[in-house]
Amino acid sequence: MSEPVSTPEHRIPIRRALVSVYDKTDLEDLVRGLHDAGVELVSTGGSAKLIEGLGLPVTKVEDLTGFPECLDGRVKTLHPRVHAGILADRRLDSHVQQLADLGVEPFDLVVSNLYPFRETVASGATPDECVEQIDIGGPSMVRAAAKNHPSVAIVTSPERYADVLAAVAAGGFTLEQRKVLAAEAFTHTAAYDVAVAGWFASTYVPAEDGWPEFAGETWQKAAVLRYGENPHQDAALYTDSSGGGGLAGAEQLHGKEMSYNNYVDTDAARRAAYDFDEPAVAIIKHANPCGIAVGADVAEAHRRAHECDPVSAFGGVIAVNRPVSVEMARQVADVFTEVIVAPSYDEGAVEILQGKKNIRILRCADPAEERSTELRQISGGVLVQVRDHVDATGDDPSTWTLAAGEPASAEVLADLAFAWTACRAAKSNAILLAKDGASVGIGMGQVNRVDSCRLAVSRAGDRAAGSVAASDAFFPFEDGPQILIDAGVTAIVQPGGSVRDELTVEAAKAAGVTMYFTGTRHFFH
């Protein structure tokens, strides 16, 4: 028997449609349009009730199959008279003949979307309630229609309803259009199955090590970017199953389109700014901080963050953990800035910033609901870890161990706590000098801690005297702390834990410098 052949045009007129949806957005417009075009409607459950309520003729599936919906709606469309009508390949004479012999009418269009499983899980529902929202008949219909796209059009999104009515008027979808719809349908069911499988693996198969045996995620293309990290690299933005929340779902209020590097730097900036409870501003370039500060308000925090390294801040990315005030907007408008991101903007602030033609202004909700784990791809796999936050036991100054010198005053301890928190935003090896709630010198990304100390002191200049220092990991030798001490640093906070801690402690004691151990490390790569 020869293989069935379809031409690219190959329109199939839409005369009979099976409609069974959970999300009834714009369904009324769709079914009215189908009815007006003379399309026979077959439907189930709530969809059929809606159609009947509009006074439109509809054949209920139970009347089609001769078998009632049962088990609280768990069984509706799982019947040969339904699936044969969906799966028959009408390019094959044998299939057409079998339908005739069985008395089954084929469907030209299937419109279906699925129970809200992911949303039910997110609502905090019980396991039984979640299981009840696992759709069975819906995915079966969707997959059947998608498989048989040479003969059937499958629509899974209300956003396609206008296309459906246009296709009806044009004599049906073309084969190429049906292929696109089928791809969307399989994407729809694949994402659904990944969500169900992931939930089952994490809920019903507890792992002794705390990590499920299966972890899955799906991403949807949100934008094609001009290029990647460099102009010769193609790039795109995809959103995860959270529905486009977080930075990926930020609202852009002004400016050129976001670039790959803009996203990387903005993500790092938000990470730094939201580590603080007080009004805070972080200025980032190449994913490293040019300056971080807290203040009585965001304008003060921005001034002080900018003062840390004004040269590097030129062309940087700014993140704020509070609404941007008019005063801060005026300050930002005086400096070339690539991106500013904030939860909101006071009246008049956006208009001031819009005076800079190319600045990208983003509004992005607080990251409180963002995921607790993060991924990093490696060759052949992916690394998954719990996201690092400043919430470990050792991040609380009340738990620190005084290793050298006198206990810090309340003011110095507050600066140490600030420096410790801010240091987490710098790439390892990281040393951060701070004074009065603002960074004054940052050394980061060096392959030895001594060079990071030198870099931090060099950038701080005269401001190093009287400042405090934080190190994201322990000092392996006393040479790093000695550089800080010689520059006039009065107190140091570090994790401790080196086999040579006593040498570091002795150097601090000899200089009368206070040193605390946190017992917590904050590497950042």
Curated annotation (Swiss-Prot):
Gene symbol of the encoding locus: purH
Record-linked PROSITE patterns: MGS (PS51855)
Swiss-Prot/TrEMBL catalytic activity: (6R)-10-formyltetrahydrofolate + 5-amino-1-(5-phospho-beta-D-ribosyl)imidazole-4-carboxamide = 5-formamido-1-(5-phospho-D-ribosyl)imidazole-4-carboxamide + (6S)-5,6,7,8-tetrahydrofolate; IMP + H2O = 5-formamido-1-(5-phospho-D-ribosyl)imidazole-4-carboxamide
E.C. code: 2.1.2.3, 3.5.4.10
GO cellular component terms listed in the entry, alphabetical order: cytosol
Domain-related comment: The IMP cyclohydrolase activity resides in the N-terminal region.
Protein name, entry field: Bifunctional purine biosynthesis protein PurH
Record-linked InterPro entries: AICAR_Tfase_dup_dom_sf (IPR024051), Cytidine_deaminase-like (IPR016193), MGS-like_dom (IPR011607), MGS-like_dom_sf (IPR036914), PurH-like (IPR002695)
Source species of the chain: Nocardioides sp. (strain ATCC BAA-499 / JS614)
Biological-process GO terms, alphabetical: 'de novo' IMP biosynthetic process
Classification via CDD domains: IMPCH
Molecular functions per Gene Ontology: IMP cyclohydrolase activity; phosphoribosylaminoimidazolecarboxamide formyltransferase activity
HAMAP family named in the record: PurH
Domain of life: Bacteria
PANTHER family documented for this protein: BIFUNCTIONAL PURINE BIOSYNTHESIS PROTEIN ATIC, BIFUNCTIONAL PURINE BIOSYNTHESIS PROTEIN PURH
Disulphide linkage map: none
Gene3D superfamilies for the chain: 3.40.140.20, Methylglyoxal synthase-like domain
Associated pathway: Purine metabolism; IMP biosynthesis via de novo pathway; 5-formamido-1-(5-phospho-D-ribosyl)imidazole-4-carboxamide from 5-amino-1-(5-phospho-D-ribosyl)imidazole-4-carboxamide (10-formyl THF route): step 1/1; Purine metabolism; IMP biosynthesis via de novo pathway; IMP from 5-formamido-1-(5-phospho-D-ribosyl)imidazole-4-carboxamide: step 1/1
Cited Pfam families: AICARFT_IMPCHas (PF01808), MGS (PF02142)
Family: Belongs to the PurH family.
Domain MGS-like positions: 10-156
Annotated keywords: Hydrolase, Multifunctional enzyme, Purine biosynthesis, Transferase
